[in-house]
């Protein structure tokens, strides 16, 4: 089995796991922190907006079953790509939308996809999601992992914080 890795930040990582986790070819989806300057930060440190980290998900996938381009398309459908200061009810730099790329091929796919989205006319504001080189990824505490399975009621409330409505308005 081939393995590749994708890292996406799209607001609260609790809401970014399920859409990928249920797809064929996904080996694992882990919540964590990346993009900052503090080694092995805690949730509390990241929430203080002093570490430079963004909440993100690290996806290990089989590229023979699901492509990186398909993952990028799933990513867009979970986020508001016009909001640089967070996602939905989650505000601040630790919730900013970012596609973290591991190599030039991923960068090319992400940039082409972003350009196509900008030209699609779906949004009347600029697409501000950043595309950045992947940095060390630190897994979040265990209670954050698979949150949608462990805490379905709370997860449903998080989804109702604007994400679900936005998806229905722009993607369905």
Swiss-Prot record:
Keyword hit for ATP-binding: no
Superkingdom of origin: Bacteria
Reactions listed under catalytic activity: L-methionyl-[protein] + [thioredoxin]-disulfide + H2O = L-methionyl-(S)-S-oxide-[protein] + [thioredoxin]-dithiol; [thioredoxin]-disulfide + L-methionine + H2O = L-methionine (S)-S-oxide + [thioredoxin]-dithiol
Keywords for this protein: Oxidoreductase
Active site, renumbered: 12
Protein's GO biological process: protein modification process
UniProt keyword Oxidoreductase, yes or no: yes
One term of GO molecular function: L-methionine:thioredoxin-disulfide S-oxidoreductase activity
InterPro entries per UniProt: Met_Sox_Rdtase_MsrA_dom, Met_Sox_Rdtase_MsrA_sf
EC code(s) of this entry: 1.8.4.11
HAMAP family: MsrA (MF_01401)
Function: Has an important function as a repair enzyme for proteins that have been inactivated by oxidation. Catalyzes the reversible oxidation-reduction of methionine sulfoxide in proteins to methionine.
Family of the protein in this entry: Belongs to the MsrA Met sulfoxide reductase family.
NCBIfam families: msrA (TIGR00401)
Protein name listed in UniProt: Peptide methionine sulfoxide reductase MsrA
Originating species: Ligilactobacillus salivarius (strain UCC118) (Lactobacillus salivarius)
């Amino acid at each position: 089995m081939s393995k590749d890795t994708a890292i996406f930040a799209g607001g609260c990582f609790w809401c970014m796991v399920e859409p990928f986790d249920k797809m064929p070819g996904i080996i694992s989806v882990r919540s964590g922190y990346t993009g900052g300057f503090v080694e092995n930060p805690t949730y509390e440190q990241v929430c203080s907006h002093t570490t430079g980290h963004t909440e993100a998900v690290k996806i290990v996938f089989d590229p023979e079953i699901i492509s990186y381009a398909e993952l990028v398309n799933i990513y867009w459908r979970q986020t508001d790509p016009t909001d640089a200061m967070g996602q939905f009810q989650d505000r601040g730099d630790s919730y900013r939308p970012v596609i973290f790329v591991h190599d030039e091929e991923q960068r090319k796919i992400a940039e082409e996809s972003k350009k196509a989205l900008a030209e699609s006319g779906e949004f009347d504001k600029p697409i501000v999601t950043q595309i950045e080189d992947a940095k060390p990824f630190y897994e979040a505490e265990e209670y954050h992992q698979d949150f949608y399975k462990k805490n379905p009621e709370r997860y449903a409330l998080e989804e109702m914080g604007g994400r679900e409505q936005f998806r229905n308005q722009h993607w369905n």
